[in-house]
Amino acid sequence: MKNLKNIVYSAIVLIIFVGITSCSTNKIKEITENSVQKKNVNVVLADLDWESVKAHNDLASYLIEKGYGYRTSKISGRSNPLRESLKSGSIDIVMEYWVIDKKTYENDINNDFFEELSINFNDYTQGAYIPRYMVEGDKKRGIRATAQGLTELKDLLKYKDVFLKEGEQKPKIISLAKTFALEGQESWKKKLENYNITSEFKMIEPENGEELKKSAIQAYENGEPWIGYYWSPSSMISKYDFIRLKEAPYDKEIYETTGMCENPNYNITIVASPQLKNNAPEVYALLKNYKTSSEITNKLLSISQQSGHISEGNMKKFLRENEGLWKNWVTKEAYENIIKTIK
């Protein structure tokens, strides 16, 4: 009888052990399969031609890779072809989609070309900028004010000779880079034409954002006159002292006809390909929560390299110092994974 009890007891223990082992094996198998599946998914971000989008790409990539185990990559290029790639699904994410043409944007969303996940930020400025020393001078650098009183774009023609360099027939005004969104380029040209600026100034279109930045910085460091399109947040405006020429307050009718007023504050959104939700659901959820501001973007830019990208060491420091910003964007498990990497 005693032997029978021992046999029954041993059988029960064996059944429990096999059950536990089977469950554990299934769980390990599930975790392994999920891990392998994630490693096979490459999340592609559009690395557009301005610094702030590169900085946001680096922040998002770090959270995606370290938090969830997905691979990421970036594709560089111009705004418009990259956005077409987003529609086709060869690009997964655009971290800064400037909603300039709202009708086309909404039409694309309604036709399932891509999906808006979040508004990244919308508290930015853009327009015609000049160095502050042109208006106020700079005693430390021995620069006298050459355009004292120039504070509004409508008055630019009164000061056109200040911008004229020796040997040139017309002064120059620097436009948006050729790689920027076509809607923005067209809006800028319309504005300048109706202010009669294009008849008195030669418009220069930089090949890319880096050339635009280089033009402004070179003039500033030499203490020379400069006028051109720029925006904030940007590393150039945060580092060098430029002022934006004022315009009349934004008016929808004026803006759409002549453009002779402030630009509207477009939403700068995060958009994703239709495939992202199924291919990388955790990434989709993360970006639905992702929201920053011009101030936060300038913080990112302050630690970026000249290219706009951020080193891993600086990114870890940013994440440590701004934990309250990103903690609620990610799941608890992803948060714990990320924390381990930044200590």
Q: Which ranges hold each PLM region?
A:
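C-terminal motif of bacterial Sec signal peptides marking the signal peptidase cleavage site
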Residues: 18-22
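An extracytoplasmic/periplasmic, membrane-proximal ligand-sensing/linker region
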Residues: 41, 52, 181-199, 210-221, ...
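Short, polar/charged alpha-helical segment
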Residues: 51-70, 189-192
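Ligand-binding pocket segment of bilobal, Venus flytrap-like solute-binding proteins
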Residues: 85, 91-98, 174-251, 343
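A conserved helix-loop-strand patch within extracytoplasmic ligand-binding domains
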Residues: 114-174
